[in-house]
Amino acid sequence: MKTITHRTNLILIFPFLASILNAAKAPNFVLVYMDDLGWAETSVPMIKGREDTSSDFNQTPNVERLAREGMVLSACYSPSALCAPSRNSLLHGMTPSRLRYTVLSAVEAKKEYLGQITIPQALKKANANYVTAHFGKWHNESIKPTAAGYDVTDGPNGNGPGDFDDDRKTHLPEEDPKRIFSLTEKSVDFMKEQVKADKPFYLQLSHYAMHIWHDSLKETREKYRSLSKGRKYQKKDDLPEEEIPIAMYNHG
């Protein structure tokens, strides 16, 4: 029987943060958080030699590039099988059960843990120059993005903005399904602004793309490719070398 050991990740990462953030050049963090994407649904084998740990249908060349140039943490378990508890756990570095946020909408102990430090707050505590941003799906009823320490945000969004315009009635245009491209452009613009201002940054880009209802560009319906990640890499020459990209799934 396999036992999964949960850890309070932010506590463990504090010494690491202190060491790298006190360096001459603070690194930039880009966390791409993917909703409803399964562990074996990209073309990257999560376990070498195991065909059942990757997809031979979905072609994700830029995720392959991330894996090739970085690390694949195949035993890095998501905090929960549900999106909202996972997002809250990632933000605070605590398990859903400890936060008492284990289902989609019920926040049982909100007042008891709002004082817990978050990733943006931890970065700012280590280096006050950090600028933090969150774009895309928030879906965390325990706390608003600004209260969590984000300087720039497009609001405490749920799943709706992934399908509808701001009026919540008009479907998104065909050229921007699930806001894939506009979210990516917004993220690239944010990064450019911080580079120009010589400010270190932390960006969390939480895509709606994999969540139902599924949508795509007309010309790519027959063949999926991770165009949004590719768009980010096409802009890499405009960004500093001190960048740590992280791709995570909130369910797998």
Mark where each language-model region is.
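Bacterial N-terminal signal peptides
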Residues: 9-19
